[in-house]
Amino acid sequence: MSLSTKREHSGDVTDSSFKRQQRSNKPSSEYTCLGHLVNLIPGKEQKVEITNRNVTTIGRSRSCDVILSEPDISTFHAEFHLLQMDVDNFQRNLINVIDKSRNGTFINGNRLVKKDYILKNGDRIVFGKSCSFLFKYASSSSTDIENDDEKVSSESRSYKNDDEVFKKPQISATSSQNATTSAAIRKLNKTRPVSFFDKYLLGKELGAGHYALVKEAKNKKTGQQVAVKIFHAQQNDDQKKNKQFREETNILMRVQHPNIVNLLDSFVEPISKSQIQKYLVLEKIDDGELFERIVRKTCLRQDESKALFKQLLTGLKYLHEQNIIHRDIKPENILLNITRRENPSQVQLGPWDEDEIDIQVKIADFGLAKFTGEMQFTNTLCGTPSYVAPEVLTKKGYTSKVDLWSAGVILYVCLCGFPPFSDQLGPPSLKEQILQAKYAFYSPYWDKIDDSVLHLISNLLVLNPDERYNIDEALNHPWFNDIQQQSSVSLELQRLQITDNKIPKTYSELSCL
C-alpha cells in the first residue's frame, strides 16, 4: 500500500511519500490534532494526523487530503467530517466518517452502510481491502499522550479488537515532535471527557437482554477484566436525562458490598449525530448464574440453598439500607463467584460440591430502572412476571417488600427445580396465580423438605405487602439457626398431591426441549 499527502506535518512520522495537503486558506498552524490513523500494514507503520478541519478527504485523487494509491481505492473514497456534539453537558469534537466508495469502507470488519458513523477510539478502519488503519482520538492529557506513544513504540503485540486480533504497530517520534503534538492536543482537548474507548478494549459478547448486551472488556492501563453493559441506542435529545444518569451512576458506584456486583464506571457515548449509548462497567463474575446451577443440578440441597439464600438476603438488606429497591430479583440476576478446590487437603467453607471450596453470591442489575426508564422497565417486568410481586403487576405503589416476594420465589425454585407460579399449573393463568398468591407445596417434590422452610416461604409469598416478611424477619427466621418450626404451615399450604395433568417441568427439563 502506498500513501501520500502534499505537505509535511510536525508530530507525524514521515517519509518521502508521507505528506499532507491543506485545502483551506486557513493557516496550518491554526489546525490542531484531533486524532490519528495508525497504519496497520507491516512495513508501513506510520500515522496520519487528522486535524479539526471541517472535512478531511481520503482517496486516490491528488486533491484528497490523504492519498491512498492502491487500485481498490476510489478516487474519492471516504470523508471525515468534524462533528461537534453536546453530550452529557460536554462539547465533544468527534469524527463522522462517510463512505463514498465502490469497494467499501469497513469499521471493525463491518461494511459502513449508513452515512452517519462516529469513529471511536480503537476502531479498525479498512478502506477497500488493502488499506488498514487503527483510529485513535488525541488523548486528553499529556500523561495519556505519553502512555499512548509508549504503547505504540513498544514491540508489536496482539490485541483483541471486538472480532479479531490485530498487531499494534511500532512507531517512533522525536521528543520535540511529541512536545509540539502534546501542546496542540491539550489546546483542543482541555475539557474533553474521557470516553469508554479511551480506557477499555472491548472483547467477546457475554450475553444479551431486553435493554442491553453485555460484553467482556479490559482496562488498558491495569489489565483488569470487566463486564460492560451496553444499553440500546436512544435519542440524544434530553440533556437533563443524561445528567441524571451521570448523577445516579455516581451514587450507585458508591454501593460496596461483598454480595453486590460492583459498578465501576459509566459513560455516555455518541454513536451518530442524533443517538447515544450508555455504558456501565461492572465487576466481572466468571462462574455463572444461580439459574445455570439450578438447571445443571435440577434442584439444590437444603443446606446449599440455605447458604446461598442467606447471602442473597444479606445483599438485599444492604441495598434496602441504601434506599435501593432491586425489583428484578431472579436466578439470572444472581451471579456466583466460586473458589475451586485445588487439592484434597483444602477445607471447605460451606456446604458446597466436592470440587468447590466456597461460593460467594453476587446480586447483579440493581437500579436498572434508572437506566432504562421507569415505564419501559415496569412493562418488561409485567411481560415476564414469574418472579414479580403482585403489586408490581398491578402497577400500584410498592416498597422494598417486592424484593422479599421475589426472594421467596427463588428459594422455592432452588428447592424443587420449578417456580410456584407457571402456566403449567393453570388454570388460572400465571398472572392470576400471582395476583391471588395461589401456590402450593406439591408432593412428592416437597416431602423431604423441612417444615421450617415451608414456613419461611409462606411468609414471603404473601399477597398483602404489609403482612409479608421484611428483610430482618427473613434473616432472623429459625431455619437459618436449624430450629424446626412446629405446626407453622397453614392447612392449604401443606404438601399437596399434584394431579397427573399438572405435573410441572423443572428448569432442567425445559432446557432440554
Curated annotation (Swiss-Prot):
Query: Where located?
Result: Nucleus
Effect on the protein of changing residue 328 to A: Loss of kinase activity
Q: Where is this region: Disordered?
A: 1-29
Q: Which residues form the active site?
A: 328
Q: Where is the FHA domain?
A: 56-112
Annotated GO MF terms: ATP binding; protein kinase activity; protein serine kinase activity; protein serine/threonine kinase activity
State one Pfam family annotation.
Pkinase
- Top-level lineage group: Eukaryota
Query: Which intervals carry biased composition (Basic and acidic residues)?
Result: 1-12
Does the record bear Nucleotide-binding in its keywords? yes
Instruction: Show the catalytic activity.
Output: L-seryl-[protein] + ATP = O-phospho-L-seryl-[protein] + ADP + H(+); L-threonyl-[protein] + ATP = O-phospho-L-threonyl-[protein] + ADP + H(+)
Residues that coordinate or bind ATP: 206-214, 229
Which PROSITE patterns does the record cross-reference, listed alphabetically?
FHA_DOMAIN (PS50006), PROTEIN_KINASE_ATP (PS00107), PROTEIN_KINASE_DOM (PS50011), PROTEIN_KINASE_ST (PS00108)
Q: Name one GO biological process term.
A: double-strand break repair via nonhomologous end joining
Residues annotated with Phosphoserine modification: 10, 139
Where is this chain primarily localised? Answer: nucleus
Protein kinase domain boundaries: 200-480
Query: What Gene3D superfamilies does its record include?
Result: 2.60.200.20, Transferase(Phosphotransferase) domain 1
Q: Which residues carry this modification: Phosphothreonine?
A: 380
Q: What class of enzyme is it?
A: transferase
What happens to this protein after translation, modification-wise?
Autophosphorylation increases in response to DNA damage.
* Assembly information from the UniProt record: Interacts with the PAB-dependent poly(A)-nuclease (PAN) complex regulatory subunit PAN3 via its forkhead-associated (FHA) domain.
Extra info from the record? Present with 3480 molecules/cell in log phase SD medium.
Q: Which family does it belong to?
A: Belongs to the protein kinase superfamily. CAMK Ser/Thr protein kinase family. CHEK2 subfamily.
Give the protein name, as stated in the record.
DNA damage response protein kinase DUN1
- Give the encoding gene's name: DUN1
